[in-house]
A protein has these predicted regions:
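Low-complexity, acidic Ser/Thr/Pro/Gly-rich terminal tails and inter-domain linkers that flank the onset
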Residues: 243-261
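Short aromatic-acidic-glycine turn motif
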Residues: 247-251, 289-306
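Short, hydrophobic beta-strand segments
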Residues: 214-219, 311-331
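Extracellular Ig-like/FN3 beta-sandwich strand-entry sites
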Residues: 219-223, 265, 333-335
Length: 355
């Protein structure tokens, strides 16, 4: 069995191998290499070697010499919809259009089409520390960020690999200043078809044919909703509501009781929300955390690849509206409390029973 790392992503590479060794099987051991930063979107394609070269690529083969070896990823729009993201060169787009050689979608289509190719192990699953140039602490290869928050690509693979009906909509629907401008809306699903609504008005349905579904929509604030349909019935939905100014926080814990002295980790995901409880996807508020009772703070993170703060500090700046707090129980029993505070934000408390 032959394994292919990055060069296995290039046009014709796997076919060349199979032509010369038709009796051998292969596995894509480090394929595909694609980038995403959670909550970041660009409508025009990014190629690493051209747009954000790795240290080992600088001064090496230039883009003009390399571009014939990559699988095309068309721009979603003629002009960039999110030019403000150019202020953040270390963040990559979540439209599955930031890559080294091939998109995640094309890579899986290719894997399915070659019976002698046993599968692929994408690089990587989680963002990880290292292999990053200052001021980054990690690369953006993962489909889950370094705070263990899923990115949009996570749901792409869910649509490909699961049978439970699902639909995932991107991007979020809070784009102040872009009223009337065209926004690419992408949907991942495993349903027969998806119908899209803006403010309860249908924009029509599209059949699922194994590819992502794309609408180009003039932005208007309000509600965007995707409804997944199977056998004529709605079986899955996803929606976003346009957010107003940050007002409070929402706390969601993976557990609300834990045994005393346990090595279990309590993971609390925090969203900045507006006065109506709608998540604010651009919020970057600084939050402080106070832990009382039989609990202790293990660490905090926000998924930002360029933040270098100590993990054990009792405060954190949210990244794209989110952050995560990790707690653990002490030896004593009782009620533990996490208090979350932020400037001009409503304070919130979360109680954990230590039993």
């Amino acid at each position: 069995i032959i394994g292919f790392n990055g060069n296995g992503e290039e046009i014709g590479e796997l076919e060349y191998f199979h032509k010369n060794y038709p009796t051998l099987c292969a596995i894509a051991t480090e394929v595909p290499h694609t980038y995403q930063t959670r909550g970041v979107y660009r409508s025009q394609t990014q190629w690493r070697r051209r747009d954000f070269p790795a240290p080992w690529e600088k001064g090496n083969i230039n883009w003009e010499q390399f571009k014939h070896r990559v699988f095309p990823i068309p721009d979603l729009t003629e002009k960039e919809c999110f030019p403000e993201e150019s202020d953040y060169p270390y963040y990559q787009s979540s439209y599955d259009n930031a890559s080294v050689r091939i998109s995640a979608r094309k890579s899986w289509q290719r894997t399915c089409s070659f019976p002698w190719l046993m599968g692929e192990f994408r690089w990587g699953s989680f963002d990880y520390l290292g292999e990053a140039e200052w001021p980054q602490r990690c690369g953006n290869f993962g489909i889950i960020d370094i705070a263990a928050i899923p990115k949009d690509a996570y749901f792409l693979y869910q649509s490909l690999w699961t049978d439970k009906p699902m639909v995932h909509l991107l991007p979020h629907w809070t784009h102040p200043g872009k009223e009337g401008k065209t926004i690419p809306v992408v949907i991942y699903t495993n349903c027969d078809a998806v119908e899209l609504f803006i403010n309860n008005v249908s924009l029509g349905s599209k059949p699922y044919t194994g590819e992502q579904l794309i609408w180009l929509i003039p932005y208007s604030p309000g509600k965007i909703e995707a409804r997944g349909i199977k056998k004529g019935k709605i079986v899955a939905t996803d929606c976003y509501q346009s957010a107003e100014a940050p007002h409070s926080v929402a706390l969601a814990s993976n557990k609300y009781s834990v045994k005393a002295g346990s090595d279990e980790v309590i993971r609390i995901e925090i969203d900045i929300t507006d006065k109506n409880g709608i998540p604010c996807p651009y919020a970057s508020n600084e939050l402080s955390f106070h832990v009382s009772g039989p609990l202790r703070l293990l660490g905090v993170d926000n998924g930002n690849p360029t933040d270098m703060f100590p993990y054990q500090q009792p405060h954190c700046r949210c990244f794209r509206g989110k952050c995560v707090v990790l707690l653990q129980s002490d030896e004593e029993k009782g009620k533990g409390t996490l208090t979350v505070q932020g400037t001009k934000l409503v304070e919130k408390k979360l109680i954990i029973e230590v039993i």
